[in-house]
Amino acid sequence: QSIKKKIKLPNRIDIKGILLEELFQEQFFARSGILLEGISIFDDKPFAHKIGFEGWAMFVYSLRNKTHAQKVKFNYLLRGRSVIGLIKKFEGKHLSPGIILIPIKNSIIFEDIFKSHKIDYSKKNILLER
């Protein structure tokens, strides 16, 4: 309760206290959201950084059902040609053909790109050591 009183924010927020051991219990539903996307209210840094990790989204995608021209166009979009590619723009990493890592903070935007281009993909949120 003392933390709630010290925080001055324009909007009301709901703060719940939990024990550290609760955070790592499987039945605590908010744990993945906190570990992957949580931001500390004390220093405005990602919670994952405090425990030595970074939150990423790993996209595995396939261009198998696309024409050659569509594949080339999409690869230019990702990697860039005459303009900066989306992987670099969104601070991502190209791991191998069909696999990209994107920081969790940019993952929704990147997911929308796959959807808008009708690309078959799967997404896994992961923590990687810093």
Describe each PLM feature range:
Residues 2-130:
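Catalytic core of pol beta-like nucleotidyltransferases
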